[in-house]
């Protein structure tokens, strides 16, 4: 019979579980008391916010339930044992909602607490005074209306970023809202234009909320300091009408001085001051002026204001009128003998004095009458006026000049008859005439031409010298006078009167004379350099008269000196020292023939070949004054006989010159090869080096480093680098020669490793040969030896897996162009007899088969001719002749040296040669 289905099983289990839980619930109801619960029990909500309250009970079947509160509700949700309600627009600082249920004729209650908080959205700092005196206290007051709870609120007063005072309101009632903080602060200078503010912080972090902070708008404080004393006023006591005088008002101890105001006035007239600051000091400067309507005593006032306070100073100032004296002449320009009246007046209250004579009373004019003469011309008249103002005597004066008209006069004092001036310095020519109007003076040469620039500063030149007629003219007449101008100047020696260069001809008659210009006329003398004798009169010219003469001219204005070079010319002449009769030219030196000729002017020299290979050829010369014909270059000069001809404008001369050619040593590859080879044992000879050159060079060769020992025969030690030097009278040449010594081969070493070999073992034969040029290595192995290997240069023979057939005699031969040498070595392969017998039987069969094929190949013509070379004989089946030739032992190397092993008598030795790739 099948069991119950799984679904039925689950249903039964659920039923049992429900019954069990019901029984347990009934038991719990019977055992536990009933209660009501309100969540959240305590809540903190922002003012105007909302909150959900959850009211629940453990009563299994409550009769009814609810939530009592004075707050506004927005929505309700219910269950059997719970109630949820949303409270909105919560504004009361504190309220206590009550959750209740009716259960088993009992009322279950739970009471909650809801408190509100308000952020410090409004932080107000009471306005500050517009100006606050430094050193006095002012009030800082901060209000935060509505923010709370107050117990969580903190207020801070700030000066800029500096904290002045901080206050928290811990312990205030929970329902308390809003706060205020007031402080008295001492005003300082550094507080000027500093911002003050208030910071409010509502800290609800202990209640699970954040920190809410806000600041007031900053308020700027302006502080000031005003001194107790009044400004200092500097001003004149009196001021003339239409004149300007400075007025200065100063006050110290101001702060901030740039914000102070200044008011300056004269009577009802406001002045415009220019204010300058220096720290806490203020200086106001203005210009005071007054009109005629302000004449009298006026009040000058200065007022300085700052921060609503002011300081004031007043001074009295008297405005007066005092015109400049009026000085008049009845005729400012009067002819000689005319009567002129002079008068002076200076206003109604001034007392005037004319030429020291005062007027009778103040306000009246002073007068003077004069019959003028020429002595009154340019006479000045002076009038002085005095006025008393406010106890102070003020003065003004005026002057005027009288001009008297008369005809010109030229006297010797103002226009001398004769002038003598030195040349050069600037002078002013004065020829003045007396007269009024002022005469114009004109000085010119009587015959016309040059005119003197009178009254102007200018240089004195010789062209100004001469006689001039000066005429003075004005409206009253004219005057005439002749004057003479003399210009003196130091001597001058020019090229016309005293040339710098004079040429004389040897044997003629000449004299040295120099003419100098100057005023007064100078004296001239000429002296030869280094001597004291003065040259005077004619003389017979000789070469020793050539040289430099010093000519000096002297007068009262100075002296002048000049060097005169005297050249004595003569015909050409040869001297052996300057132009040798025999000259040797060295090839390649680039040196030219020097043929110096005595003569003036310098002769032109030309040397031309007269016979042989040099006939008609021009010899190149050192002198730049050579002939015009084409000459040889220094590299192809031809020896021979040359005729040298020297010519100048005074004659010519001829000289014979014999030219010979020589050359320095020269070596090259053809005469002295740089690489030479000797054969060891040959007769020792010198290096094959020679050199070209005249005279014939001597060649000497020496070894570099260690010296070469003198031997009869060439040795290997003679190899090395040699330096060959060729020398003659004109120099040296050298070459470096490398000498190589070649020698026949010698097998210096033939060794086996290991010395004895067991069957199946490995062994190696090493062959080392000494030879130059390097030797070719070849091997001869025992017949039947297979599986042989050779190194790349055949110097090593190796066997892997040795057998009895590998035992026997091996020969190593070294061969080069100078001979052949061979050595032999015997290899033994030892082992047990049983191994030998078995191996021998097997090996014998193999050897018989291999031997037949090998014999056929070894006897072949190709092997005899040595035409094959293999890598591995055993693997490839190819074979070569190990002696490399396949002929008789002496076919390439000649007879073997004593002590070496000999080849078989029949001359046919064949073996297998193995070479590696």
Swiss-Prot record:
GO terms for molecular function: integrin binding. Keywords: Cell adhesion, Disulfide bond, Glycoprotein, Immunoglobulin domain, Membrane, Phosphoprotein, Repeat, Signal, Transmembrane, Transmembrane helix. Disulfide bonds join 55-99, 59-103, 142-198, 249-302, 344-383, 415-470, 498-551, 579-644, 672-724, 767-812. It is a single-pass type I membrane protein. Expressed on neurons in the most rostral segment of the mammalian brain, the telencephalon. Pfam families: ICAM1_3_5_D2, ICAM_N, Ig_3. CDD domains: IgC2_2_ICAM-1_like. GO terms for cellular component: glutamatergic synapse; plasma membrane; postsynapse. Residues 884-908 are annotated as: Disordered. Residues 48-130, 135-235, 242-329, 337-402, 408-486, 491-567, 572-651, 665-738, 745-828 form the Ig-like C2-type domain. It is found in: Membrane. InterPro entries: ICAM, ICAM1_3_5_D2, ICAM_N, ICAM_VCAM, ICAM_VCAM_N, Ig-like_dom, Ig-like_dom_sf, Ig-like_fold. Glycosylation at Asn-54 is critical for functional folding. Residues 32-833 are extracellular. This is Intercellular adhesion molecule 5. The lineage of its organism: Eukaryota, Metazoa, Chordata, Craniata, Vertebrata.
């Amino acid at each position: 019979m099948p069991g119950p289905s799984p679904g039925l099983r689950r249903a039964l289990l659920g039923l049992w579980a429900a019954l069990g839980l019901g029984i347990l619930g009934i038991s719990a109801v019977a055992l536990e008391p009933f209660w009501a619960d309100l969540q959240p029990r305590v809540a903190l909500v922002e003012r105007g916010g909302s909150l959900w309250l959850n009211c629940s009970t453990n009563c299994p079947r409550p009769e009814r339930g609810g939530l009592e509160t004075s707050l506004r509700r927005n929505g309700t949700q219910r269950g059997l044992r719970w109630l949820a309600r949303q409270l909105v627009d919560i504004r009361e600082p504190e309220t206590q909602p009550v959750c209740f249920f009716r259960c088993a004729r009992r009322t279950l209650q739970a009471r909650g607490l809801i408190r509100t908080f308000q952020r410090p959205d409004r932080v107000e700092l009471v306005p500050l005074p517009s100006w606050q005196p430094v050193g006095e206290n002012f009030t800082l007051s901060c209000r935060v209306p509505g923010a709370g709870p107050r117990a969580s609120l903190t207020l801070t007063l700030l000066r800029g970023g500096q904290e002045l005072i901080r206050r928290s309101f811990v312990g205030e009632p929970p329902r308390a809202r809003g706060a205020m903080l007031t402080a008295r602060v001492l005003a300082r200078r550094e507080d000027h234009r500093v911002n003050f503010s208030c910071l409010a912080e509502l800290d609800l972090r202990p209640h699970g909320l954040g920190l809410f902070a806000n600041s007031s708008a900053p308020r700027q404080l302006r502080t000031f300091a005003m001194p107790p004393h009044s400004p200092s006023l500097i001003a004149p006591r009196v001021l003339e009408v239409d004149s300007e005088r400075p007025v200065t008002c100063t006050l110290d101890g101001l702060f901030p001085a740039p914000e102070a105001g200044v008011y300056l006035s004269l009577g009802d007239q406001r002045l415009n001051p220019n204010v300058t600051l220096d720290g806490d000091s203020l200086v106001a400067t203005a210009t005071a002026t007054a009109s005629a309507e302000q004449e009298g005593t006026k009040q000058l006032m200065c007022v300085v204001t700052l921060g609503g306070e002011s300081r004031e100073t007043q001074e009295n100032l008297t405005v007066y009128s005092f015109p400049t004296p009026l000085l008049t002449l009845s005729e400012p320009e009067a002819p000689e003998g005319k009567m002129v009246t002079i008068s002076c007046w200076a206003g109604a209250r001034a007392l005037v004095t004319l030429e020291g004579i005062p007027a009778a009373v103040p306000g009246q004019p002073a007068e003077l009458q004069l019959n003028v003469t020429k002595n009154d011309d340019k006479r000045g008249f002076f009038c002085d006026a005095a006025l008393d103002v406010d106890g102070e005597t003020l003065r003004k004066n005026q002057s005027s000049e009288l001009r008297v008209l008369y005809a010109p006069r030229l006297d010797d004092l103002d226009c001398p008859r004769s002038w003598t001036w030195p040349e050069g310095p600037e002078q002013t020519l004065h020829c003045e005439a007396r007269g009024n109007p002022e005469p114009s003076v004109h000085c010119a040469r009587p015959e016309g031409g040059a005119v003197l620039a009178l009254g102007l500063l200018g240089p004195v030149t010789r062209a100004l010298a001469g006689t001039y007629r000066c005429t003075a003219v004005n409206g009253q007449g004219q005057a005439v006078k002749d004057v003479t101008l003399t210009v003196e100047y130091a001597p001058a020696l020019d090229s016309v009167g005293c040339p710098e260069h004079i040429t004389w001809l040897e044997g003629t008659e000449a004299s040295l004379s120099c003419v100098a210009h100057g005023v007064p006329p100078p004296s001239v003398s000429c002296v030869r350099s280094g001597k004291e004798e003065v040259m005077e009169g004619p003389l017979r010219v000789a070469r020793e008269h050539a040289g430099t003469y010093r000519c000096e001219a002297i007068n009262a204005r100075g002296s002048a000196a000049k060097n005169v070079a005297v050249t004595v010319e003569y015909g050409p002449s040869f001297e052996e020292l300057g132009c040798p009769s025999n000259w040797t030219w060295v090839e390649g030196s680039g040196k030219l023939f020097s043929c110096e000729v005595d003569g003036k002017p310098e002769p032109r020299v030309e040397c031309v070949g007269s016979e042989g290979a040099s006939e008609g050829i021009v010899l190149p010369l050192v002198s730049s004054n050579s002939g015009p014909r084409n000459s040889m270059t220094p590299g192809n000069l031809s020896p021979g006989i040359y005729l040298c001809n020297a010519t100048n404008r005074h004659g010519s001369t001829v000289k014979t010159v014999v030219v010979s050619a020589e050359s320095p040593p020269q070596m090259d590859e053809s005469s002295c090869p740089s690489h030479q080879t000797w054969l060891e044992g040959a007769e020792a000879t010198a290096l094959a080096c020679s050199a070209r050159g005249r005279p014939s060079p001597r060649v000497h060769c020496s070894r570099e480093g260690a010296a070469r020992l003198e031997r009869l025969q060439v040795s290997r030690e003679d190899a090395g680098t040699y330096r060959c030097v060729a020398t003659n009278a004109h120099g040296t040449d050298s070459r470096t020669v490398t000498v190589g010594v070649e020698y026949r081969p010698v097998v210096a070493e033939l060794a086996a490793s290991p010395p004895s070999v067991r069957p199946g073992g490995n062994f190696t034969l090493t062959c080392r040969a000494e030879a130059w040029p390097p030797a070719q290595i070849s091997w001869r192995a025992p017949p039947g030896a297979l599986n042989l290997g050779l190194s790349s240069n055949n110097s090593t023979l190796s066997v892997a897996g040795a057998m009895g057939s590998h035992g026997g005699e091996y020969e190593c031969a070294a061969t080069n162009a100078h001979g052949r040498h061979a050595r032999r070595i015997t290899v033994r392969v030892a082992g047990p007899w049983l191994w030998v017998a078995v191996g021998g039987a097997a090996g014998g069969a193999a050897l018989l088969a291999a031997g037949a094929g090998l014999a056929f190949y070894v006897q072949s013509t190709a092997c005899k001719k040595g035409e094959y070379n293999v890598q591995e004989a055993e693997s490839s089946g190819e074979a070569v002749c190990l002696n490399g030739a396949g002929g008789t032992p002496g076919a390439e190397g000649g007879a073997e040296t004593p002590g070496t092993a000999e080849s078989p008598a029949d001359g046919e030795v064949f073996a297998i040669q193995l070479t590696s790739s």
